[in-house]
């Protein structure tokens, strides 16, 4: 096949490149203004992206780094299943962690973009639904197979030629606790992806479809060149790091103890490439702390890009990661095999991996990394019937801890760190939407690890259920038995802790899951 070389002047390239990223940003704005659930419209637990026709990511919005590695797999799943059977006006949906997803609550809406019957690429919006079924409100439960984690959607055609498959929509909504809210969130995802495809059509009419497709390839190639050039300026070396997760949420003995398990990583830098190897990591576990490889990859990419490109000069897309090779045998906790449960691992393992990559890099480029951050998404879900209106509710919150100490300054208090980029749900919105009252939300003093530069302090938050409120809760946390580590002689940060006080006044410590 004869290679076609497209010549582009630098000014036009910058305009088109930035247009792709602005399209992803506009998707974010549309979703935030139209979503129903506080988790989406206030906390921002979603990611938006523009993809070329094979499913490679051309541009990601300023969203969640946790999705860097797995969103391209989500779009590639659509390409693999439907091939050329993709038409203007179609929309696809899926959430299968073993088919390009991350965990079941993260629902992918994928819409192809056409101009004059030519496929330009895809837009994808991954949004965390506060509930996707299962026995536990919020879909976070200590189960031993993925079948217990909620409704699992393989790649499906939700809209065909502009016509909604209402039977599929009814099936989805029948399996969640808050169907009206989920219907509104799904509509917001559809609106955002539609806006993005319309923007791509405008670009195609301006520059021509063939040239626009060529620009997509050039943007990814540009990121690859930038990443490799940055790597060439850094020292070669090999570093290893080992850490232990608190457990998988499944009791391992009669006393209810939850055994730790090990993750081991080595990072080797050779010229303009990196090899990340998880040899020595424990096998997949019984509970939902098993990560699909794409989730692990997200943690790797986040940790590496933060260290190597701290000023974000390299546009994040699939081109960035061509210089990075990830090795992880199937069946490890970082490359789980079906039907292992995965819901906790999406954020807890990727948090862990991102911090551990920094720990490994500290062996040969210590001035590029920071110490361990809070190292967990610290999730609390509550669900039941709201006594104020008699309706089912599901609340899903992530609590912000501290940012790790940096080579030349302290960490930041109470901020999303590592693989996360979500915001606090404002207390006023939380109390309006759910039958809870937040009695305290404050910095936990002296909780950051001590050192020449201290780690950021964590947060203390106190919830009280309103009188008459029916609530079933679930926790998903790490760093209770394995506190955030320091680097280069820095001390560990404070361990996480959760207590429950019942109406009779008795207070007890809760496990991490």
Model-assigned labels for residue ranges:
Residues 1-88, 93-513:
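Glycine/proline-enriched, intrinsically flexible loops and inter-domain linkers
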């Amino acid at each position: 096949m004869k290679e076609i070389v497209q010549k582009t002047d630098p000014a036009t390239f910058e305009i088109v490149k930035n247009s792709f990223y602005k399209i992803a940003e506009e998707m974010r704005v549309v979703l935030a203004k139209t979503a129903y659930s506080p988790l989406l419209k206030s906390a921002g637990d979603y990611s938006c992206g523009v993809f070329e026709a094979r499913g490679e990511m051309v541009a990601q919005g300023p969203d969640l780094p946790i999705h860097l590695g797995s969103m391209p797999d989500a779009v590639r799943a659509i390409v693999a299943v439907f091939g050329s059977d993709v038409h203007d006006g179609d929309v696809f949906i899926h959430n299968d962690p073993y088919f390009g997803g991350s965990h079941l609550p993260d629902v992918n809406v994928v819409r192809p973009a056409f101009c004059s019957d030519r496929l330009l690429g895809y837009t994808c919006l991954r949004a965390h639904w506060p509930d996707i079924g299962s026995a536990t409100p919020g879909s976070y439960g200590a189960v031993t197979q993925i079948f217990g984690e909620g409704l699992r959607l393989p790649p499906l055609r939700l809209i065909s030629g502009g016509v909604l498959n209402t039977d599929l929509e009814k099936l989805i909504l029948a399996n969640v606790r808050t169907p009206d809210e989920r219907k509104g969130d799904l509509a917001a995802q559809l609106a955002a992806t539609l806006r993005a495809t319309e923007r791509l059509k405008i670009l195609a009419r301006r520059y021509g479809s063939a040239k626009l497709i060529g620009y997509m390839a050039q943007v990814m190639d540009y990121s690859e060149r930038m990443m490799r050039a940055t790597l060439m300026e850094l020292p070669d070396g090999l570093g290893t790091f080992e850490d232990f997760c608190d457990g998988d949420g499944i009791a391992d003995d009669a006393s209810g103890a939850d055994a730790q398990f090990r993750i081991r990583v080595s990072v080797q830098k050779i010229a303009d490439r990196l090899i990340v190897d998880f040899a020595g990591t424990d096998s997949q576990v019984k509970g939902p702390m098993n990560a699909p490889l794409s989730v692990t990859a997200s943690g790797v990419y986040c940790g590496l890009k933060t260290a190597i490109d701290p000023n974000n000069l390299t546009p994040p897309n699939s081109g960035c990661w061509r210089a990075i090779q990830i090795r992880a045998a199937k069946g490890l906790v970082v490359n789980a095999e079906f039907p292992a449960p995965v819901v906790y691992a999406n954020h807890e393992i990727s948090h862990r991996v991102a911090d551990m990559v920094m720990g490994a890099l500290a062996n040969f480029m210590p001035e590029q990394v920071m110490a361990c951050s809070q190292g967990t998404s610290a999730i609390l879900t509550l669900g039941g019937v709201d006594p104020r209106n008699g309706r089912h509710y599901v609340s899903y919150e992530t609590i912000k801890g501290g940012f790790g100490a940096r080579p030349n300054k302290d960490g930041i208090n109470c901020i999303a760190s590592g693989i996360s980029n979500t915001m606090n749900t404002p207390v006023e919105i939380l109390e309006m939407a759910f039958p809870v009252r937040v009695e305290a939300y404050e910095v936990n003093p002296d909780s950051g690890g001590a050192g020449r530069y201290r780690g950021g302090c964590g947060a203390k938050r106190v919830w009280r259920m309103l009188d008459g409120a029916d609530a079933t809760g679930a926790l998903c946390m790490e760093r209770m038995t394995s506190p955030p580590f320091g680097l280069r002689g820095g001390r560990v940060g404070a361990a996480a802790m959760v207590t429950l006080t019942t109406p009779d006044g008795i207070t007890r410590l809760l496990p991490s899951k």
